[in-house]
Design a protein with these regions (language model features):
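Terminal amphipathic alpha-helical/low-complexity segments used for targeting or macromolecular assembly
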Residues: 1-88, 199-233
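Structural signal for interior beta-strand "rungs" in well-ordered beta-sheet cores
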Residues: 85-192
Length: 233
C-alpha cells in the first residue's frame, strides 16, 4: 500500500477511535447524572448535579484518569486523580475499575484503592473505604458486585467479594466475603439477612461489640480456671 494511503488509513483509524472515546465519555456522563437524579431526592436538575455534586465530579475525573492509566500514561493519571482528591475530598486510585451508574453520595472521606473493582449501579456514602489490610500482594482491594449499597463510614478491607444486591450497614467493617442478596452489619461485619430472610436479631442499632464479646470470653475463661484450681485443692 502507498505511504499516502497508509497515512490516510491511520488518520481515519485515529478519528474513529477518538469519536468512540468521546461518545463513550458522554454516554457514561449522562448515565451518571441520571443515576444521581434517581437516587438523590434532593437533586433538582442535571445542571445542578454536574456543577455542584462532588461525587459526580470525582467519578467523572476518575473515568478520565483511568483512560490515561490504561494507556500507561501514569503521571497524567495520578495528576488528575490528585486534582480530583483536592477538589472533592474523595480519593480514587486511577487504576480502580468502576462500572456504570456509580453514585457517591455526600462523598467526603471516600477512599477507593488501586485494585478495587466496582460493578454497576453501586452507591457508596461518605467515609467509605475500599482498602487493603496490608497483608496481601497483587489483588489487595475488594470486588463489589452490582446493585450494592455501602453505608457511611463502612470499611471493606482486603481482596474479598461483596455479592450482587447486598447492603453494608453504616460503620460496618467487612473482612470476609458477603454473599449476594445479603445485609451485613457490625464490627466485624456479620450477615443478618439473606435473600429476604432475617438470620438473627441483630440490626443497625444492636451492633455486636467486639470488645464486650472479648471481655465476656475472658471472664468465662477465668471462671473455668478458678474451678480447676479449686478442684485441685
Amino acid at each position: 500500500m502507498e505511504p499516502r494511503l497508509l497515512r490516510l488509513r491511520s488518520l481515519l483509524t485515529a478519528e474513529d477511535f477518538l469519536f468512540t472515546e468521546v461518545f463513550c465519555v458522554f454516554k457514561q456522563l449522562r448515565e451518571d447524572i441520571e443515576c444521581v437524579k434517581a437516587r438523590d431526592p434532593a437533586a433538582r436538575s442535571a445542571i445542578e448535579i454536574y456543577f455542584l455534586y462532588p461525587g459526580l465530579k470525582a467519578v467523572r475525573m476518575h473515568r478520565l484518569a483511568n483512560k490515561f492509566y490504561n494507556k500507561k500514561m501514569y503521571f497524567m493519571a495520578r495528576w488528575i486523580s490528585q486534582r480530583a482528591s483536592k477538589k472533592t475530598g474523595i480519593e480514587i486510585h486511577p487504576a480502580a475499575t468502576i462500572g456504570k451508574r456509580f453514585f457517591i453520595d455526600h462523598g467526603t472521606g471516600v477512599v477507593i484503592g488501586e485494585t478495587a473493582v466496582i460493578g454497576d449501579n453501586v452507591t457508596v456514602y461518605q467515609g467509605v473505604t475500599l482498602g487493603g489490610t496490608g497483608k496481601d500482594t497483587g489483588k489487595r482491594h475488594p470486588t463489589i458486585g452490582n446493585n450494592v449499597m455501602i453505608g457511611s463510614g463502612a470499611k471493606v478491607l482486603g481482596p474479598l467479594e461483596i455479592g450482587d444486591n447486598s447492603r453494608i450497614a453504616a460503620g460496618a467493617v467487612v473482612l470476609k466475603d458477603i454473599p449476594p442478596n445479603s445485609t451485613a452489619v457490625g464490627v466485624p461485619a456479620k450477615v443478618v439477612k439473606r435473600d429476604g430472610v432475617k438470620l438473627d436479631d441483630l440490626d443497625q442499632i444492636h451492633i455486636p461489640d467486639p470488645v464486650a464479646n472479648e471481655i465476656s470470653r475472658l471472664e468465662a475463661e477465668i471462671e473455668m480456671l478458678k474451678k480447676q484450681i479449686n478442684n485441685k485443692e
